C-alpha cells in the first residue's frame, strides 16, 4: 500500500512538472473572409478577400522557456498576398505585426514574442513591427462553445464574436472551409461581429464584419 502511495506521488509530481513546462490558454481569431461557409461563397471570395487576420492568445497558466506568462496575452496581425488558406497558392508571402501585452516585464515580453513565433510559424516569420499595448481577451463564462468573446489590444486591434446560429446558414451546406491559423487542442467557428486593425505597421488598416470569419479555441503546448 505504501509503495502504491509513493508511486502515486511520483506520477502526480511528474504530471505537475510536465504541465508547468508549457503554457495553456484561450485563442481567438478573425479574418476578412468567411471560414465557416460553403463552396458558393468560398469560391466567390478566394483571392478577393481573406488576406488579413487578427489573432490572439491568452495564457491562463504555465511558463515558456522558464518564464511565467500566466495572465498575459499576445496578438498577431497579418496581411498576405493571397487568401489565407488557399491551397492553390502554397507560397503566400505574409507580413506581420506583433502586439505584446504591455503589462509584461522585459523578460516576459521576450518570452511572449518567442511563444507567438512558435505558434504562428511561417505566418509570423516576417514581423515588420512589434507594438506594446494592454491586451484583454475575455470569453463569456469561459466557454468557447458559447461563442461570445472579445479581444482588445489597446486601440490597435479588436475582435468581438458571438455563437453561430441557424440563421447564419445561407447555402445549407456550410462547413469549416478554412482551419484555424494555429494549432489548437479544440476550436469552434464563431461569428465575428467586428474585427479591426488600426495600427501603422502594415501600411493599411481595416474594419471588418459582421461575417462568419472567427474561431475560438483552447491550447496547451510544451515549452521550447
Per-region residue spans from a language model:
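N-terminal Sec/ER secretory leader and immediately downstream segment
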Residues: 21-100
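Bacterial N-terminal signal peptides
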Residues: 7-16
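Mature, soluble, non-transmembrane domains
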Residues: 99-221
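Positively charged n-region of N-terminal signal peptides that target proteins for export
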Residues: 1-6
Amino acid at each position: 500500500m505504501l509503495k502504491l502511495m509513493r508511486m502515486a506521488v511520483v506520477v502526480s509530481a511528474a504530471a505537475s512538472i510536465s504541465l508547468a513546462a508549457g503554457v495553456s490558454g484561450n485563442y481567438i481569431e478573425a479574418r476578412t473572409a468567411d471560414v465557416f461557409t460553403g463552396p458558393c461563397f468560398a469560391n466567390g471570395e478566394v483571392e478577393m478577400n481573406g488576406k488579413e487576420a487578427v489573432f490572439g492568445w491568452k495564457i491562463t497558466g504555465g511558463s515558456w522557456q522558464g518564464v511565467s506568462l500566466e495572465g498575459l496575452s499576445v496578438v498577431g496581425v497579418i496581411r498576405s498576398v493571397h487568401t489565407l488558406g488557399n491551397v492553390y497558392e502554397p507560397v503566400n508571402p505574409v507580413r506581420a505585426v506583433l502586439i505584446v501585452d504591455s503589462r509584461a516585464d522585459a523578460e516576459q515580453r521576450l518570452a511572449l514574442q518567442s511563444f507567438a513565433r512558435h505558434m504562428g510559424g511561417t505566418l509570423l516569420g516576417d514581423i515588420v513591427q512589434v507594438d506594446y499595448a494592454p491586451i484583454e481577451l475575455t470569453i463569456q463564462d469561459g466557454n468557447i462553445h458559447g461563442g461570445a468573446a472579445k479581444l482588445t489590444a489597446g486601440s490597435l486591434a479588436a475582435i468581438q464574436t458571438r455563437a453561430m446560429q441557424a440563421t447564419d446558414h445561407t447555402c445549407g451546406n456550410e462547413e469549416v472551409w478554412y482551419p484555424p491559423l494555429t494549432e489548437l487542442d479544440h476550436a469552434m467557428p464563431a461569428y465575428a461581429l467586428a474585427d479591426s486593425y488600426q495600427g501603422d505597421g502594415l501600411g493599411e488598416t481595416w474594419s471588418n464584419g459582421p461575417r462568419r470569419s472567427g474561431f475560438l479555441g483552447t491550447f496547451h503546448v510544451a515549452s521550447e
